[in-house]
Amino acid sequence: MNTTEEQQQIAHFLSKQHVLTLCAGNGMDMWCANCFYVFDAGQMALWLMTETHTRHGELMLQNSRVVGTIAPKPKTIALIRGVQYRAEAVMLSGDEERLARARYCKRFPIAKVMKAPVWQLSLQEVKMTDNTLGFGTKLHWTRT
């Protein structure tokens, strides 16, 4: 499988999921949170909403480098599919924020009443395990 095919497989998986685990830290403190997200394939980015006063929000303001996972709960080992990622987190503003918020609220209509900031996780590296392609199959993507 070439890099383009791997990226397409990863993008397809990310577009079908909606919950990620986000891990943020500042060198002294670390915290994980589960967040709903929308995937932007054109930018290879994840958009989420979270307040700056949450523990993970405060940590992302201190250190934009984050890691996390996206993994549904399969019924058997043969169906395991999931992603580990490394990303740069930034709170969006202006036109970027309006576009991301509109897409987020379209996917999660309840978010229309929320005033939380929209963050972009620009994926830097992704490793996907996909046992549906053969036990232990790994797909990789790295931003160049």
From Swiss-Prot:
InterPro entries the record matches: Split_barrel_FMN-bd (IPR012349), UPF0306 (IPR011194)
Protein origin, superkingdom: Bacteria
Gene3D superfamilies: Electron Transport, Fmn-binding Protein, Chain A
Ranges in coiled-coil conformation: none
Family assignment from sequence similarity: Belongs to the UPF0306 family.
The protein, known as: UPF0306 protein Spro_0510
